[in-house]
């Protein structure tokens, strides 16, 4: 996996780059300027937990969010089983799932409603099988809480980080420590846990070869 500092003010994530993990600041209510997802999707599912908390839902947030994640997992598993039956020549008809872009915004908030077990099950299915069955998932993290399965999330094809995060967030998700040491600088000793080297519009990117 290569790590680089993207200074061209834009990062475009194409289908081959999924699943993608976006690390951004907690006070950001919109996608970073210059960051784009390039997927020709038939459907888009944006699970915006903060918006759901603000506007409310007909059911409890635990039920609402849990059911959305369960539906996605069930859909991927169903197509995986269909593909297996086709491979065994039990089914002749070729069934291709529609392309779905899924944005989980944000994963740290989702955890609060589905718990560790639910989140781990969802991530495992999506990271291993989602893209294979046309489910392209972007995981957004705005607060790197201790309970997040970081080692599992590092299996994402692409990791993109914006400026001004806590220094430990970068070191948790990016393995090239020597490279990080050369680019992560602090502006003030009173804020030694805050990285201020990046200019607005720059991105730290890691992609699997």
Predicted regions located by residue number:
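Conserved P-loop NTPase motor module
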Residues: 1-23, 30-45, 49-51, 67-75, ...
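Loop/turn-to-beta-strand initiation segments
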Residues: 18-19, 41-44, 96-101, 131-138
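Switch/connector loops and helix/strand junctions flanking conserved nucleotide-binding motifs
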Residues: 30-32, 55-56, 110-112, 147-149, ...
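Walker B catalytic acidic pair
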Residues: 105-109
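Conserved ATP-driven motor cores of ASCE-family P-loop NTPases powering translocation/secretion/packaging/pilus
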Residues: 120-209
């Amino acid at each position: 996996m290569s790590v680089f500092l993207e200074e061209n003010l834009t990062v475009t994530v194409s289908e081959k780059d999924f699943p993608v993990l976006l690390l951004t600041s907690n006070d950001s209510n919109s996608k970073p300027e210059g960051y784009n997802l390039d997927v020709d999707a038939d459907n888009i599912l944006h699970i915006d937990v903060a918006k759901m908390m603000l506007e409310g839902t007909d059911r409890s947030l635990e039920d609402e969010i849990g059911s959305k994640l369960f539906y996605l997992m069930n859909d991927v598993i169903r197509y995986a089983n269909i593909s297996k039956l086709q491979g065994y020549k039990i089914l002749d008809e070729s069934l291709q799932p529609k392309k779905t872009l899924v944005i989980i915004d944000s994963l740290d908030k989702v955890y609060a409603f589905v718990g560790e077990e639910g989140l781990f099950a969802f991530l495992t299915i999506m990271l291993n099988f989602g893209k294979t069955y046309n489910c392209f998932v972007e995981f957004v993290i705005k607060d790197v809480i201790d309970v997040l399965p970081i080692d599992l999330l590092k299996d994402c094809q692409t990791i993109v980080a914006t400026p001004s995060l806590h220094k430990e967030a970068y070191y948790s998700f990016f393995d090239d420590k020597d490279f990080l040491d050369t680019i992560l600088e602090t502006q003030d000793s009173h804020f030694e846990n805050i990285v201020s080297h990046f200019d607005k519009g720059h991105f730290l990117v890691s992609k699997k070869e």
